[in-house]
């Protein structure tokens, strides 16, 4: 008896709303832990479910959303213990499934009535069962479908429709004689399950809702794929979409056209994502991809499988959306539920109903931060920070740096120029030189924003078109300085001559400094100056060679040398005189009177 009660309770009689009502008070007071960076937690889903459910019931009172409370485990157990439970009268067969498509199909008679029988009562006689349909025939048809070989001559959807439309087993025999094709190996069939990037939009054609899908890499002559919507959307109600269109929208752009969607169900269909977000406007669904490791599977066809897949597979937990118009992003945000400073939208999958997924738009007002209007911005006190989490706002980064190193006058988040979406880097200008030097010496900072907490590195921000700080362009014919020394003892721009003089002659402790070079949008730290062509470069050996060459040039050249050479020789001669007053280095210990 206990087993039967448990089995009856396992049928889909309780929805997420009923589960939310049964949760304990401690669980309802528990806040999200924040361990997951992008995926919503179970506690968040339970808390959000009551908010979604109440608003849905107030809007349309859909009976499909509310379930029969009498089908709970406690009620079934009490009735079975009293031995007076009538399955045919008490159980609402339509309430066992919250899939609107299935209920519509049962009502129209498109599926066998055997599917609507109560669970665990195979001997129950229901008048609506077709007498010509028995379990053996149904099992035979299912086995025939599963064992059917693939053939490119006939689409699989048409074949399945023909099989389900037939009531006799003789109609299945032509499909069981299909020959297996040799065009693709069997192991490559799962490649079709990989999610693909598509530009989608929900439109109305001939009074029918359809999804227009097209490959973003296709040519202009490629015809789009039209998918009819034979059912209402499982995620966003139509009245909710209409309500968002009635809300006032800003004429100025408020968000980036690129939106992050996190916490997707692992088995969500890409068509469900298309239908949900394509209703707000034309959008590119960009599934992130990562390398696929075969782990020894594939056999002899490993090369074909990996080449057909291009060593990539889609990541199911999140997706990026790139809308054509920024207005669509505003409508999407208006349709979301705002909960604990985050936006959520419901989305369903075959195994999860009304899953709360996070919608994370990027506000354009979070790109820059200014301490005040009167604060000056000096690029010589600017640092570069890479690896910044994309949800981090400029004000959050400024607050983290001020707690560690000092006052910040400006913070700018590096964004994509077209989409205005963060690239994961930032530039920070300090209010004074002391804070700038402390930040360069500290090298790291802990950035905290919402659920993210990351340690990032601080580097000097190298600018282009800067003259040498030592000679002001005199020794390099007024060319721009190619090197920048990021050590806290230097922090200057140098030409080639001044780099050698300041690092190998004037100060011995700077010989191990490494130059920083700006190439395009990137800054590289080189192991040695590029004008030193020796593959076995050593700072100490170059220091001695440079000193000998400068000393010999002073003896060989007279007053007929150029002004640049005289300046270099004068500086090197002065440094030699200063070095002669010091005690030379000796490997053996010095004695008194040496």
Swiss-Prot record:
Source organism, top-level taxon: Eukaryota
PANTHER family xrefs: CYTOPLASMIC POLYADENYLATION ELEMENT BINDING PROTEIN CPEB, CYTOPLASMIC POLYADENYLATION ELEMENT-BINDING PROTEIN 1
Name assigned to this protein: Cytoplasmic polyadenylation element-binding protein 1
GO biological process, one term: cell differentiation
One cellular-component annotation, GO: nucleus
Region: Disordered, residue numbers: 1-33, 519-560
Pfam families assigned to the protein according to its UniProt record, in alphabetical order: CEBP_ZZ, RRM_7
Function: Cytoplasmic polyadenylation element binding protein that binds to and regulates the translation of specific mRNAs. Essential for progression through meiosis. Involved in spermatogenesis.
Residue span(s) of domain RRM: 257-364, 381-452
Taxonomic placement: Eukaryota, Metazoa, Ecdysozoa, Nematoda, Chromadorea
A molecular-function term among this protein's GO annotations: ribosome binding
Compositional bias segments (type: Polar residues): 11-22, 535-560
Swiss-Prot/TrEMBL keywords: Developmental protein, Differentiation, Repeat, RNA-binding, Spermatogenesis
Protein source organism: Caenorhabditis remanei
Encoding gene (name): cpb-1
Keyword Repeat among UniProt keywords: yes
Subunit structure: Interacts with fbf-1.
